Amino acid sequence: MANIKSAKKRAVQSEKRRKHNASRRSMVRTFIKKVYAAIAAGDKDAAQKAFNEMQPIVDRQSCKGLIHKNKAARHKSNLVAQINAMQ
């Protein structure tokens, strides 16, 4: 454990940020899973709706640095391709 006052403060701030980021990361993963679940169920309308809900959230979190922008782009690209491939 830190002895210096500023180091203690940084440890508290770091833990607070870790919890906040974990919550946001979990939310992003949940929205992505909803799209994959709709695709697996074969429901194109539900998949499109879930994707439209997921896209701005993923973009917002990638702009804030929670996930890398290339990872966000990769998720969106793969999901759009799978939705378009559905009958």
UniProtKB/Swiss-Prot annotation:
InterPro entries: Ribosomal_bS20 (IPR002583), Ribosomal_bS20_sf (IPR036510)
The keyword rRNA-binding is assigned to this record: yes
Pfam families, sorted: Ribosomal_S20p
UniProt GO molecular function: small ribosomal subunit rRNA binding; structural constituent of ribosome
Highest taxon in the source lineage: Bacteria
Spans annotated as Disordered: 1-25
Gene Ontology cellular-component annotations: cytosol; small ribosomal subunit
Gene3D superfamilies noted in UniProt: Ribosomal protein S20
Assigned keywords, A-Z: Ribonucleoprotein, Ribosomal protein, RNA-binding, rRNA-binding
GO biological process, one term: translation
Coiled coil, from the record: none
The keyword rRNA-binding belongs to this UniProt entry's keyword annotation: yes
Function: Binds directly to 16S ribosomal RNA.
Family in the record: Belongs to the bacterial ribosomal protein bS20 family.
Listed PANTHER family: 30S RIBOSOMAL PROTEIN S20 (PTHR33398), SMALL RIBOSOMAL SUBUNIT PROTEIN BS20C (PTHR33398:SF1)
The protein's name in its UniProt record: Small ribosomal subunit protein bS20
Species name: Yersinia pestis
Lineage: Bacteria, Pseudomonadati, Pseudomonadota, Gammaproteobacteria, Enterobacterales
